[in-house]
């Protein structure tokens, strides 16, 4: 038996309202959450057409020649940045004027694998063996309204299609629990002199990958308590007269404890690394995750929070490097420091839902630009007054110094002078020196943790 997809009714209305306007097809993304028993779809969004495609797509004879995988995968990557923890791009859809043919299903299959590969390439985390590895393709014939729903195993490029059930349900968007936390980070990334061929972006990602292990191995307090991962998240909540568990609050406070010292099983000798500089990433970020309220497990909730922490930090660094590349900012002299504004997080309510999506705003961007970007990427209208700015401006400091000092310095006094309440500071220090990167084995039986939250 194939998987079952429980779909918010408004998604069905959205798909029905898409007008082909003489085009051969319209494609897009399906967004929601996987669970062991079934998947939940709460949002569908069409891929915005390229301007140069507007004329070509009006001719049905073009068929699938105009299904631009590169454009569709770029859209998927942009949308993936806007999803909080717990939500994923579950698959792709296509609405056509033609009856189902193998060409359409093959094209959908290729598109689905391309989208998944593109999104996964930028993640700091990997799916576990226990997680659902199937993704969905949905084909709708505009003339007959017939639906063809199939899934593929993303871990097997040669997997064949499996039929799946597509069921609409009202009120799905209100059946979600939220988890919120503020995470303070202080990441030091040495830039190896032997890896000069690596770009700054690649070096930074390598450093973030090491930091990600700390987040993965952290201890997570939910409403101040450490809970067994196999417990029900709503355990201890009041029950209704019908015996159903009712959450007294739809929001949970999460705090993170990261391991400060290693135990004796992780002995390591000191290593010396020749470095040309270093990157320091410091500050606080607001994180938010959502999980469906149907028998939620603690481990699923914690996993959603972990992934939101990793995603939001990695996405901001990537956006900063993209901005620097696009604007072609000239390098400063060796003795000068350079400050750049990192994007800060803005949450946006999904219309008719308790779930909030997010976007990122640079300091020189207006609220109108964020609204327009949201509408372009997700094809849904929002109001400017609904934007929730969760953070203060985050600032990046890039400095260059050709002296021979060690780069394991304290940068607290080198932050910008303007008042910043919630700051993510990225300091890039260029120098000719030696960094002693070492790990000390701890013989004590206990494990120390560093309090890593607000």
From Swiss-Prot:
Transmembrane portions of the chain: 82-102, 432-452
GO (cellular component) term, any one: membrane
Membrane topology: Multi-pass membrane protein
Keywords recorded for this protein, A-Z: Membrane, Transmembrane, Transmembrane helix
Domain of life, per lineage: Eukaryota
Function description: May play a role in the trafficking of a subset of G-protein coupled receptors.
The protein, known as: Protein odr-4 homolog
């Amino acid at each position: 038996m194939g998987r079952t997809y429980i779909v918010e009714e408004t998604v069905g209305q959205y798909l029905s309202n898409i007008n082909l306007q003489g085009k051969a097809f319209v494609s897009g993304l399906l967004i929601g959450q996987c669970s062991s028993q079934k998947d939940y779809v709460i949002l569908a969004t069409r891929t915005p057409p390229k301007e140069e495609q507007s004329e070509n797509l009006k001719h049905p004879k073009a068929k699938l020649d105009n299904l631009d995988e590169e454009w569709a995968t770029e859209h998927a990557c942009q949308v993936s940045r806007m999803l909080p923890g717990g939500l994923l791009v579950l698959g792709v859809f296509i609405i056509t004027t033609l009856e189902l043919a193998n060409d359409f299903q093959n094209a959908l299959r290729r598109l689905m694998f391309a989208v998944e590969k593109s999104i996964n390439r930028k993640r700091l985390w990997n799916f576990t063996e226990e997680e659902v590895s199937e993704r969905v393709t949905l084909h709708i014939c505009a003339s007959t309204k017939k639906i063809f729903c199939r899934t593929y195993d993303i871990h097997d490029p040669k997997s064949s299609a499996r039929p799946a059930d597509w069921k609409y349900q009202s009120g799905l968007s209100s059946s979600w629990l939220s988890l919120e936390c503020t995470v303070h980070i202080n990441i030091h990334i040495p830039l190896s002199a032997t890896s000069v061929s690596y770009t700054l972006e690649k070096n930074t990602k390598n450093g973030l990958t090491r930091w990600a292990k700390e987040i993965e191995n952290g201890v997570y307090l939910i409403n101040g308590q450490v809970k067994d991962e196999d417990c029900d998240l709503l355990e201890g909540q009041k029950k209704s007269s019908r015996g159903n568990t009712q959450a007294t609050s739809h929001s949970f406070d999460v705090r993170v404890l990261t391991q400060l010292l290693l135990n004796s099983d992780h002995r390591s000798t000191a290593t010396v690394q020749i470095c040309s500089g270093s990157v320091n990433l410091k500050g606080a970020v607001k994180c938010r995750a959502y999980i469906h309220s149907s028998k939620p497990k603690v481990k699923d909730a914690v996993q959603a929070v972990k992934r939101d922490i990793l995603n939001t930090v990695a996405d901001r660094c990537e956006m900063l490097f993209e901005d620097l590349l696009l604007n072609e900012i000239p390098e400063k002299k060796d003795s000068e420091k350079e400050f750049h504004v990192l994007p800060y997080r803005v949450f946006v309510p999904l219309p008719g839902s308790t779930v909030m999506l997010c976007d990122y705003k640079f300091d020189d961007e207006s609220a109108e630009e964020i609204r327009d970007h949201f509408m372009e990427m997700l094809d849904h209208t929002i109001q400017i007054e609904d934007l929730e700015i969760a953070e203060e401006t985050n600032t990046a400091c890039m400095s260059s110094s050709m002296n021979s000092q060690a780069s394991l310095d304290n940068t607290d006094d080198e932050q910008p002078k303007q008042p910043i309440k919630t700051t993510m500071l990225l300091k890039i220090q260029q120098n000719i020196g030696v960094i002693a990167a070492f790990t000390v084995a701890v013989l004590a039986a206990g494990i120390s943790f560093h309090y890593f939250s607000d």
